[in-house]
Amino acid sequence: MDTKDYLNGKANDAYGYFGPVKKTKGYMFRICIPHARKVEIIGDFNDWQPKKMRGYASGVFTITIKEAKIGDRYQFLITDANDEVIKIVDPFAQEIIVEEKCSVVSDNSYKFKNKKLKTDKLNIYEVYMGSFLDSDFDGLIKYAKDQNFTHIKFMPVSEYINYKSMGFTSSGLFAYCKRYGSALDFKKFIDKCHKEKLGVLIDLDLAHFDCDPYYIKSLEEYFAYDYDDVKYSYYGDMNFDPTKNFTKSYLKSAVNFWLKEYNLDGIMLTNVENMIYWQGDEARGENDKWIDLLGDLIEEIHQNKSLALASFNGIYKYDFDFDYCLDYSLRPIIRSMQDLPYKRDSYKKEINSLIGSDNSKKILGFNYIDSFLDEASLFMKINGSNDKYKQYKPMLTLLYSLKSEKLLFTGDEIGSEQIFSVYDRIGLDKLSEDQVYLNDFYKDLSKLYLKKEELNHVDSTTKLLDVEGYSLYAFIRSYKEKKLLVIINFTDIDYEIKSSYDLVELINSSDLKYGGKGNINGKINQNETIFIEDFGSCVFEIKK
C-alpha cells in the first residue's frame, strides 16, 4: 500500500500495512497520526518500556522490533504539542484484549483449503455467536445443513467493549472478538462450512464506532475519523465521517479485510439508513457523501466475488447495487398474527400486496429483532394459547412461497418460546413434541423451496388468485411451464374451495406427520373440492 493512497481515500488494503506486519525477524509496527509530536510503543517485547517510533512527513510513525512475536501485547503512546501523553489501542489490531485495553500481535498464517460457496439460492440462518459460546461449532454446521440452510449469518463478530450489547458498535473493526474464541478457530470453522457447501456471512455496522477513549476516539485530536461537528449518533456512539479520505480508506480496508482474510461469502451492512440519511433520520434528508461511499463499499464486496447485503430498518426502496436487502416487509404478517383471528382480514390489502410484489432483490424473513421486540419471541407473538404451533405453520408457508430469498433467526425453525437475550443460550436440543412436529414441517417446507424453481428461480412469477374467505390467500407460483398452487388460511375457519386444476398435493400443514389432524387432500381433479383446515396451509403441483 502507498501511504498517499490511504490519505487520499483510495486504499483498500491498509490492514496489511499498518499494525504489526511480519518481517524476516520480528514485526514492523506502523500507525498514522499526522498531528502527533511523538509516538512510542510499549509491549511485552520491550518490558513495557517506551520505545520511540520514527516519524515521516506523511504522518506515519514506524518501528521494527525483532523481539516481537505472536501473542505479544502492545500499546501506542502518543505525545501531543502540550506534552500530554495518552495510551491507545492499535486501530488496525487484529486481536484486542478488551479488559487490558491493549492490542495483540496475531497469527495470520492460516491458509484456506476450500473455496467460497457458489449458489443462487439463499436460505440464511441468523446466529448470535454469544448463544453458542459453550457449544460444538462443528455441530452448528451439521444442524444448519440438516435444517436446509444455505448460509449461516453471524451477527457482528468484530471486537466490541460492551458485552451486554449485541456488538453492533465496534471498538476494533479488524479484530475478531476474543469472547467468541480465537480468529484461527473462526477461520477453521469457515473452512469447514465451505467443505460442507455451507456459506458464511457476517453483519458489519460501519456507520459509527465506540466512543471509548482508548480506541479510535483517542485519535480525534490528531487524525479524527469522526465528524468535526456532529460527533455522536442517536445511539450515543461516534459517527464515521465519510467526507474524510482516510475514513474512506479505513472502512474500505475493513470490508476487504473480512472478505479476504476470512474468506467470507458476503457481508451484510447493517442499519444502512444511518448511512443514507443524516443521523438515520429520513426527515433530515439524504447524506450524499455516505451514499457515495456506500457505493464504493458495495463495489469492494463485489470485487471479492462476494454477496453485498444490507439490512434496513424500514421498507427499502433504493436502487443501490446490493445483491439483496433485508427490511421490514414482513411486519404486517407479524402484526396480523398478533391480532385475534377474526380481525386478521383487515390486513388483507397489505398481505396481498406483499404476495404480488416482486421481492427478488430482497431477503424476506424474521431476524433477531422479531425475537425480542415486544418482549416476546416470534413464536410467542402469535395470538392464542393452545394453537400457536398450528398458526405458526401458515406463517412459514407464506414466507417460503414468496418470491424472495429467506432468513430465519436462531430458534424460529422450532418455534422457540425464548426471548432473545445476549445473556442466554437458545435451546435447540431438547424439543417438545409440538416443536418436533413443527420442525419436521419446516424442514420439508424449506427443502421444497430449495428444490422447486417455481419458488426459488429469479425469473419465476406470482399470480394472486381471488378467493372468498376471511384471511384466506391463494396464489400461483410459476416458472416456464411448471406451476404450483399455494393456499394459506390465517383464520380459525375451515374452507372448501372448488379446484380449477388437476392437482397433486406436495405439503400440507395438517398432515399427521406434522402433528395435524390428517385432513390432507392428496390428488385433486378439476372441479373437485380442496379442503383447507383452520390455520392450514398447503402447496400443490398443478398438472393441468
Named regions from a protein language model:
Residues 86, 93, 97-99, 263-265, ...:
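Conserved alpha/beta catalytic core and glycan-binding cleft of carbohydrate-active enzymes
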Residues 426, 431-439, 445-447, 498-522:
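C-terminal accessory region downstream of the catalytic core in glycan-modifying enzymes
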Residues 32-39, 46-48, 491-492, 500-501:
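Short proline/glycine-enriched turn/loop motifs at strand-loop junctions of beta-rich domains
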Residues 429-464, 536:
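Aromatic- and carboxylate-lined catalytic core of secreted/periplasmic carbohydrate-active enzymes
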Residues 31, 76, 127, 154, ...:
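Conserved, mostly hydrophobic/aromatic
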Residues 1-28, 33, 48-126, 131, ...:
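The feature marks proteins involved in alpha-glucan
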Residues 115-118, 128-289, 293, 297-303:
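Substrate-binding/active-site clefts of carbohydrate-active enzymes
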